[in-house]
């Protein structure tokens, strides 16, 4: 959505500005390295963005950075712990509507974490709670391209495609568009 694109830009512009400011403060305190003399900064680069799935699991109830959620409800099967994970924002809406019930969550699980079948959600809410595979993958490319101008290194961008279901020409087009839009790297499918 346009709102998501605007927020994406605001967030990464703010991160860039704050990281540059911090680098300037470090340069004031510790001096500029020889390679950066005259730039007023301590660091040559300040940002590289990766999906942080493992870190988000360890920290609990935080997002995996730029990575869309794979499901709104799933069982996380770790080496030492098996736990059920619910999208807490979705859970809050369901509670407000008196729909935070086992039957509803079971239906979400049966649909691979999707909520598109739930009549109790508005169309806008269904759009907000799309899973990684439900989001048009070009939208992920477009958001990555939009924020790249604020990132001085690169982003680790994952796309969710099933090569058995998506024609090779469509996959190729995603990669070409990403390259044309200045996205430096794409990973996993």
Q: Model-derived features: where do they sit?
A:
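Internal maturation/activation junctions in enzymes
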Residues: 1-52, 123-127
């Amino acid at each position: 959505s346009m709102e998501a694109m605007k927020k994406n830009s605001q967030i990464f512009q703010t991160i860039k500005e704050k990281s540059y400011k911090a680098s300037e403060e470090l340069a004031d305190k510790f001096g500029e390295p020889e390679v950066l003399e005259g730039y007023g900064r301590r660091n040559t680069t300040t940002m590289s963005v990766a999906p942080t799935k493992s870190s988000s699991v360890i920290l609990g109830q935080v997002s995996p950075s730029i990575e869309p959620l794979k499901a709104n409800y799933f069982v996380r099967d770790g080496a030492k712990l098996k736990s059920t994970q619910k999208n807490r924002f979705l859970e809050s809406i369901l509670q407000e509507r008196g729909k935070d019930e086992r039957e509803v969550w079971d239906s979400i699980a049966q649909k691979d974490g999707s909520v598109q079948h739930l009549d109790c959600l508005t169309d806008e809410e269904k759009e907000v709670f799309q899973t990684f595979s439900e989001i048009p993958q070009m939208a992920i490319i477009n958001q990555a391209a939009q924020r790249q101008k604020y990132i001085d290194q690169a982003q680790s961008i994952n796309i969710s495609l099933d090569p058995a279901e998506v024609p090779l020409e469509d996959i190729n087009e995603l990669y070409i568009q990403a390259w044309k839009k200045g996205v430096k790297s794409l990973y996993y499918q």
